[in-house]
Structure formats: structure tokens, C-alpha cells
Amino acid sequence: MGPLRWLPLLGQLLLLWPRAAQPAGPIRAFVVPHSHMDVGWVFTVQESMRAYAANVYTTVVAELVRGGQRRFIAVEQEFFRLWWDGVASEQQKQQVRQLLHEGRLEFVLGGQVMHDEAVTHLDDQILQLTEGHGFLYETFGIRPQFSWHVDPFGASATTPTLFALAGFNAHLISRIDYDLKDAMQEAQMLQFVWHGSPSLSGQQEIFTHVMDHYSYCTPSHIPFSNRSGFYWNGVAVFPEPPPDGVYPNMSEPVTGANIHLYAEALVANVKQRAAWFRTPHVLWPWGCDKQFFNASVQFDNMDPLLDYINQRTAQFGISVQYATLNDYFQALHATNMTWGIRDHQDFLPYSSEPLQAWTGFYTSRSTLKGLARQASALLYAGESMFTRYMWPDPSGTLDPTWALQQLQQLRWAVSEVQHHDAITGTESPKVKNMYTEHLRMGMLGVRKLMVSIALGGPPGSGTGAPKDIMGPQVTPVLSVDTRPVGYSASVYNPLAWKITTIITLTVAFPNVSVTDELGHPVSTQIQNSTKDPSAYDLLILTTIPGLNYRHYQVMHARGDQAGTRELVAPRANTLKFSLKLRNQPSQEGKRLVPVMNDCYILLFDQDTNMLHSIQDRQSNRTVRMTQEFLEYQANWDVKQGPISDNYLFAPNNTAEPSWEAVGMEMVAGTLVTDIRQYFYRYITDQEYIYSIHTRLAHPSLAGELLCQRIEQQYRVGPLDLNREAILRTSSDLNSQQVLYSDNNGYQMQRRPYKAFKSNPIPRNYYPMVQSAFIEDDKSRLVLLAERPHGVSSQGNGQVEVMLHRRLWNNLAWDLKYNLTLNDTSIVHPVLWLMLGPKSTMTALHPRSGVALQHGPVVLLKELADEETPVHGPHNPWPVTLPPNLHLQILSVPGWTYSRSHAQHLRNLQRGHPEKPQANLQRVLLRLRHLYEAGEDPVLSRPATVDLKVVLRGLGSVVAVEERSLTGTWDVQMLQRWHWSTKTDHLKGHPTSPPRPPGGSIITVYPKEIRTFFIKFQQ
């Protein structure tokens, strides 16, 4: 193991790497004071604010004012915003403005949080960055220019593109595979220019600095003391700061007796690090988790130490200075060195030691992961619905200020949960509950907003009661009493494409009639519910233009009324099969039951109750395919070996089947056929522990996206303790054990199986944020997910998805912070499967992933006996984009800053006696090209659209201004630093040139993301 395993990779990289050089002295150390402030993790946000976070900003500001040479970088915005709005005095606010102006306080990264890179979706990464950047720019007129991504557990290749588009000049990471980092240190390859996307030009690359193995914390061991070094304020105490100001583990104060020893320790560490880099400039991070809550004692000890070293530069061979990232990267950039290039590979998965693979968190707390994505999808729909309500003219009584507040609350919650100890599932239970509460409260507000828009009037108005709103993968439940009663259902399509799909409502009666807004009957199906044996699932076929509505009336059918025969939803037929044992002898493949549509024939084996094969009707190829649930067993005792926990995946052995018997039933109707498989852990069990509900839409339905997908929803749990559950799909595809999985729903990574000498199973697990696939020379099997999972290919033709984990161990760290993941929940994840020729799958894969993430939203209102159905808004002009272009956001952000940077700075200098009202006139539009260059002969072409035509339903477009990713830069003013590389990058297309404001015809190239402010005629 160790660095030798990476020699082939390093050999390839060195071809693009300049010859290593030893740093020319004297060494210049940049001491960067910082505090790593997790937005959650072990303690809630409010607990952290009370115990230490507020004191960080209060004391740092005071100490920076005291000493002109002092510096500090601030990273995540959530704690700072809470301090700014709820703690800071006017004097402190003015001091912050002055320190920012002087460059002694620097905001880096600037997002609401430091987001995880493995399991977060691109849309949500952009959201949380936009939230933080919007606040900083609106409040101070500043725009962060460097990243500080030091704690996410691995690094995604999406990040270089993301941060380049945000305007960053350099990027800093830390957690990459331990043996790769060791090898890169020895080869002086920790700094390079990273090309994030194979399709994009060098304008969307970024200079990247990988921290050495000391990472972002100051070395804690000093040879002359049994206390930690350089942590003079000690360790934060919860729930309250100690009244005497004495904290645990406070470093020995710097005195005349020990200052030389301190200096020797610091100098030795700087020199050790300098050998790992190509220049004499050394970044020396001073800080760690929850530091600088007493900045006075920190600086009062470091000041004399730095002075002591600088007075003896000739003796020590180094100089030291307080620095921000701008100071460090400016010095590095001024060397004009030629840097190596890293292509679009990521740094995933991440292992910190040989037996510590951080791949368990890809699945930990699956329920929270699912809720976070549901909240994101709801916010996405709510943003465009509110924008369509506001333009061209608000027609209802809705208060726009209240509406924007609901959206802002959910923006905050969705941004917060992207933190690297949030959606990852690596937080304590009470912090998980905090994230959940914030998400649910935000979703409730946006639900009220959407019901008000779609069903008319202010929140709660009208004679009928709004029932609820449901996003994708959530089924609304309608109940009735003995009176004739019905429901008005509005279905909103948040995508800028026309869609044909099936929505599901759960009702309490089998006789239902459904009509559209014109009173015409629609295609429906009713069947026994999968959730409640006393209820029924009502399926409705719907076709909806982009950013538009369909309205339906759902009534309890009474048969003949006044001579009119109601059209009742046809009832599906159910066929049940007897229970089958897993090890029961059978003549496999002799009694197959087909389920088919225009695209597929699914064959199920009556003798096993298992999927047998799938025929792709386009290519006429039949692929043998089985699916089953298995479990990995995890060790709980640290004395017995490696353990699994929230972070780590360390199975004892290969996965074993977790069931003894399986039942099956088929429910066939006019719209779909459902196949329901129930897996029992033991033959004597009355309750099943696992299930697969497979749905195939029928051939008469239009729409290739609907026909080409096999929808599956699973039930998993509750698990036995120390079990990690997977769904393994095995096929006869000759995949060569090569898996492809996505980075953040943006780009795919090739994942060949690696034969590690130790820990091979978990080190071959990868994050699947939205999709994964395996293929051979003829066919591709695609899996699409509505929440993150761990995914792996442990055998040829296999792909396994980890669905759930339940763990407890006796590791002292986990027990101290309650991080053992004893998750007793039942989870219901969804996957869509697609199988077909690679060309067909290439075309359908990106659009289908977006369709799963952003399904139609159903809004319901109960009707009284005589009440007329509410048909809600009708938008005559849909918003329609080409199939290779995705409407990533359409919103009214509410920012008050001027689009002119100079004017905005003048406004800030004048000051505002009161906070200005939100700007409801500015519309934010972001478009994303879904395809890689050369991926598809048609869909990989640049997409050209006229925004005046696309947005005509919102009004007359009078100006189009292109902005940076988070909206704070006019792209015509954005000039990022150029870092010289050995080879000119010839790959990628030329980025389309910015057009002057008002130019409405735009071209988006493969994988481009372009952001605009749109101005409509008043």
C-alpha cells in the first residue's frame, strides 16, 4: 500500500508537471489566523453561538483594532450573520467595515456554510454560496476571492468549475486520500491548476492548494511542554463559557523563559512544510475547531513570538507575518511560476488511514438526506412560481413581502443543511433534529405561499381549507366523510420543458371521478394503496407545459346524477403469488411473467418471485438481471478491529442476503403496472423488512422519458444493530467492473475497481448524488436517485447501492459526542432504472435525472358541498427551453444592491438609516447546459435561445445582464488571476463572450452555467 500505489498516476501527472525545485531562502511564513466553526455537527447553532461563536467575532474585531499588523480570515457566514444581526453594536459594525476596507479582516469562501463536496447537489451548493455572497456584497460591497474548503471529506471535480464561476482566484482544500497526499508532498505537487470539467475552457479552471498532512490546524504537539502548542485560549466549553475564563488545555503562555523554545518549534514546523512546496512561501494556518473565542490571549502570545523570530531571521532562516489568504496567494502569484495541471478527476473517496475509508457518510441518515433534497426541490418550484406570480403583474391579494420571507426562510434552511457535517449524516441526533426542524418550518412556509398562489387569495382564505402541497416523491392523502365532497388539485410543472407524467393521490374511497379545467374526463387508474391497506392510490396522467399548471377536480363518484353518468377511474387488477423461500429449489426461468410497455419487457420468475431479466425493445437485447437486498455486518468493538460509524464504512466481510422469503403481487391497470415484492428476514415473520415497488408506465402513453424509466421505491428497515443495507443489481453486462458515478449531479466520473491490499470493499465505494451507471459495448444500465447514496461495483455486471445504516460502537470519540448512528428509522428511497443502447441512454440520462429531482408539485384544496372548484392561475405562455438546456433557477432574490458596483459602493458610504425594502423587480435567471462536449451528436451542440421569446409570458424583457455565478459580479468586470501552466490547454470550447446589457440572444455551450439579471418592462 502507501505512496507506491499512486506511482502510475503520478507518472502521468508529472508529464504535465514542471520540474521540482527546492525553495530558495529565506522562507517566508504566512501565519493565517482562523477559527473552524461548524454550523452544527455536535452542538446546535444556538448552543455554539452561546458557548463560543459570538465571542469569536466580538473578540477578534476588538483585537484587530488594537494591533495594526494582526489579521484574521472568516469563512462560513451563518454564525457571522447571526452575530451581525443579533449581537454586534453599531460601533462593532463600523469597526468591521473599516477592517474589511484595510484588508486585515478577510471573508474567504463566503458561503452560508462550508458545504460538503461528496453528497451535495450542484444546485444547493450554488444556493448556499449565493446566500452568503449576497449578504456580504449587499452589506459590505465585498466579494470573496478565495476558497477555504479545508474540512469536507474528499474533493469533487465540480468544485473548480463552481468556484471559478463565482469569481475566486485560488482554491484551498485539505482532506484527500492519505497515501496520495503523502506522494504529492514528496513530489512537491500539492499546488496545481485544476481543470474541473472536460468540456470547459481554461476560463473555468482554478489554482488549487492542497494543505499538507498537518491540515488546517496548528501543530498541537510542542516538545518542551505536555500541553498543546499555540492554543492559548484552550478548548471551548459548552453550554456556557466558564465564569473564571479558564478553559481546558490552554497552552503555556509565552514568556522570556520559553519564547526561544516556542520559536524553535514554529520554525522547525515551517521548514518541514517548506520542503513539500516549490516556493519559499509557506502557508501556516493558526487555529483549529472553535478557536479564537478569546482572541486577546491568542494575539497577546503570538505577537511577541512573531517579533522574536523576525528579529532573528538570519539565525532562523525564515520570516513570519500575520496574513490573510489574499496576502499569501498574492505572494505566490507574484512568483510567476509555471504550475502543473490536474485534469477533471476528483479526490473521492477519502481515506484518512489504511483502514479508515470515509465512505459510510454517503448513506448515513438517509431520511435527512431525502428531506434536504425534497426541501431543495420545493424551494426550486416555489421560486419560479412566485416569479411567475409577480410578472407581468401580480393579480391576487398576496403580500409580496410576506411571500419573499417564506422563500428566504427556506433558502436559509436548505443552505444550512449543505454543511459538511449536516447532509452528510455525521452530526449528533440533536443537531439532526435542528436541521430537520429548520427544513420543515421552511417547507411549511413555502407550502402556504404556493397554495396561496395556485388556489387563490392570501394564506388561509376562501371557504375551503387548503389541504397540503406535495413535491416529487410525496403522495398527498385525501380523506372524505359521508357528505359529497371533492378536491381542487392544481399541478405545477417547475421545469422549463413540457412534461408528460403520472401523479399519485391517496384517497379513502375506490369510486373517483376526475375532470380537468375544461370539465373533460382525464386518464386515471385506482388501486389499493401501498401505504395504507384501507386506502386507495389514484393515478392521474397529466401533460403540463413548462412553468405552467394543470387543474383537476377530484370528486367522490356517485354514479348517475341528474341523468349524467360520471366517468369513474378504472380499478386495477391485483394478482398475488405465493411466498417463495430464498433457497427453495426451483426450475429457474421456466415460469416467467412478462410486464411490458413500448420500451421494455420485464420478466419476473414465478418460482422465485424475483426479477429475472429485462428486454430493451429498442435494441431487442435481453439482459439477465436480478435484484436483492443484502447487509454488511459491522464490528462494534474497537478492540476487535475497525468500526463503522457516521463517517466510516468498515464491513467485517462481504455482504450477505438479509432475507429468507419473498412475496410478490402484480397490480395491472390502464396507466401502469406495479410489481410489489416483499422481503421477510425470517419465514416466520409477519412483517416484511424490505420491499421493492416497481412501476412501469404503459405503451399507450406519450413521452419517451416516461416510457424509458423503470420506477422503483424501496422500504428498508428498521435494521438490526450494526447492519448496513444494500440493494444489489446483478446483470450479465460485461462491465469489466467499471462504474460511473456523478459529482454533485453535474458530471460523471469513471470508477474502475481498484484492488487495494486492505479495505477493498469500502475504498471502492463512491458517492452517487444523482446518478450512476455500468455498461458494456452494447448497453448501459443507468440508476437515478432522488437522494444521495453510496454506490459500488463489487463484481462484473454488478452495481450495489447502500440504502440505510444502523450502527453503534464503543469508540470513545463517538460516545462522547453521540455520533454512533443508532438509526432505527424506516427509509423509502426511490431509484429510476433505465436500460438501453449507450446512445439512447446518453440522450435521456441528464434530462431524466432533472425530471426525478424536480417532478410536478401537487397543491390541494378541499371543496365544500356547493363550492365551485378553484382553477387557479392560467399562464397562456409557457416557458420552454431546448432539451439540452435546464432552467437552473428563476427567482426574485430580493437583493437591494445596485447592479453598478461603483453606485453600490457610493450607496454604502452614504449609509442607510433603515434597512431598504427588498427589490422585487430584479429577476435572477440561471441556465445550465446538461451535456458534455461530444457526448451526443445533437444534444451536445451549443444551445442558442432568445430570452425575449423564452420569457415572453413574464413580460417584455428590456435588459439582460450577465453576472457571475452568485450574482455579485458583472461578468464584464470580472478579471480572475491567470496562473501559468506548462502546456496550453487545447481542450474545451471558447467561452461565449459576454454580451452588452440588453442583448437577449444567448448561446450556452456544453456544461456551461450562465447567470443573468433580467429586467422587464414595468
Curated annotation (Swiss-Prot):
GO biological process, one term: mannose metabolic process
Note accompanying the cofactor annotation: Binds 1 zinc ion per subunit.
Catalytic reaction(s) noted: Hydrolysis of terminal, non-reducing alpha-D-mannose residues in alpha-D-mannosides
Top-rank lineage group of the source organism: Eukaryota
Cofactor(s) annotated in UniProt: Zn(2+)
Location (main, coarse): secreted
Residues reported in the UniProt entry to bind Zn(2+): 36, 38, 151, 420
Name of this protein: Epididymis-specific alpha-mannosidase
Species the sequence originates in: Mus musculus
